[in-house]
Amino acid sequence: MGKYFGTDGVRGEANVELTPEMAFKLGRFGGYVLSQHELETPKVYVGRDTRISGQMLASSLISGLLSVGIEVYDLGVIATPGVAYLVKKDGASAGVMISASHNPALDNGIKFFGGDGYKLEDEKELEIEALIDAKEDTLPRPSAQGLGMLHDYIEGVRKYQAFLKTTAEGDFEGYNVVLDTANGASYTSARAVFADLKANLTVIGENPDGLNINVKVGSTHPEAMAKKVVETGSDLGLAFDGDADRLIAVDENGEIVDGDKIMFIVGKYLLEQGKLAQDTLVTTVMSNLGFHLALEEAGINSVITAVGDRYVVEEMKKNNYNFGGEQSGHMIFLDYNTTGDGQLSAIQLLKVMRETGKTLSELASEVTIYPQKLVNVRVKDNAAKKSAMDVPAIQKVISEMETSMNGKGRILVRPSGTEPLLRVMAEAPTHEQVDHVVDTIVEVVEEEIGVK
């Protein structure tokens, strides 16, 4: 991570940390870095989610892009993976998504995709940061015909919808589905896609007002969807987050099916079809012990990375794997798209149900999840977050708790990549054990570096 770029672009409270001035600089300098080797006039796609600050930041970012001679195509409200898909398909120079994903409405973020549809490499981000921090802006300032132009690209969403539908390889007629679009980016696509695939739909979280994105809806709050699934007697529920790069499901009984279980279900099906590259699934350190045991039982190899879908994708690209993801619901199908895609993941999950004839609860029952607890501790600042593991008292309590578990469980303490939070997670055979371990560590963290 750099000074401005975290694990998922530049994030902060909109108009306080992530200001219009910063958005302009990111557009100007980011656009320059990503297009300086173009032989023709560079073309950049810009999308956003439904946050009230999105239009403000988009106008500033676009101004920066135009100032260095870039042709900008405004996609409007669209899912993050839609930007990545269209950039690669249309041969654009780069793409930019304005979103803070699952974060609340007061936050926003800006992330870049290269012309290949993948998130930027660290080297490119550092190059952009160096230009932002330079004492003087020495980039070209073209005038008249050298300036870029802004184009509305409303058909981009329709192209993305058409792509999603092709991945179903059939339809979902007869399935009753609850969709939760989190009052976010997928409200422009999810209903249309699944209706065209002939599913019977009930949709919640489909009325964004700029402030209600992720509020008691979406993949981080699936309770409302679970209730609706039971009320309507639906076969399953599918919840996306604010920018629709995640999926969390709910079975016909209202039980949550997280990213680990979805990855197992789809991974096992791909293995049986001979379509799981090298019989391997890529996941992160956050995935549950029970998930790994189920993979082993099914004959699936696993490769573990640091937390963050960018690290999963890097591993997949490096070793030619085609499927991976995170417990949080990011799932990457490199045979279809370059980044996590909630709607694509939902289609693949429904496809497994259709092809096997099994209910979601039957498919998910093959994974026995160990009790897990995760607590986010708000710390003083980002410096405290990064140095937390150097604090003797924190080191000591983690060591003591690991000893107390006798090898039957695990502890993971790590800084958030996007917020001043320290994440404390543990897994153990019983809920009592996991509560004791996490609560004990959290108490020490709060005492040492927490916000008083």
Swiss-Prot record:
CDD domains: GlmM (cd05802)
Top-rank EC class of the record's enzyme: isomerase
Binding residue positions for Mg(2+): S101, D241, D243, D245
Positions carrying Phosphoserine: S101
Cofactor binding mode and count: Binds 1 Mg(2+) ion per subunit.
Sorted UniProt keywords: Isomerase, Magnesium, Metal-binding, Phosphoprotein
Protein role: Catalyzes the conversion of glucosamine-6-phosphate to glucosamine-1-phosphate.
Keyword set includes Nucleotide-binding: no
Post-translational note: Activated by phosphorylation.
Full protein name: Phosphoglucosamine mutase
GO biological process terms, semicolon-separated: carbohydrate metabolic process; peptidoglycan biosynthetic process; UDP-N-acetylglucosamine biosynthetic process
Designated gene of the protein: glmM
Record: active site: S101
First and last residue of the signal peptide: none
Gene3D superfamilies to which the protein is assigned, alphabetical: Alpha-D-Glucose-1,6-Bisphosphate, subunit A, domain 3, Alpha-D-phosphohexomutase, C-terminal domain
SUPFAM superfamilies in the cross-refs: Phosphoglucomutase, C-terminal domain (SSF55957), Phosphoglucomutase, first 3 domains (SSF53738)
Family: Belongs to the phosphohexose mutase family.
InterPro entries: A-D-PHexomutase_a/b/a-I, A-D-PHexomutase_a/b/a-I/II/III, A-D-PHexomutase_a/b/a-II, A-D-PHexomutase_a/b/a-III, A-D-PHexomutase_C, A-D-PHexomutase_C_sf, A-D-PHexomutase_CS, Alpha-D-phosphohexomutase_SF
Organism name: Lactococcus lactis subsp. cremoris (strain MG1363)
Cofactor(s) needed: Mg(2+)
GO cellular component, one term: cytosol
Annotated catalysed reactions: alpha-D-glucosamine 1-phosphate = D-glucosamine 6-phosphate
One MF term in the entry's GO annotations: phosphoglucosamine mutase activity
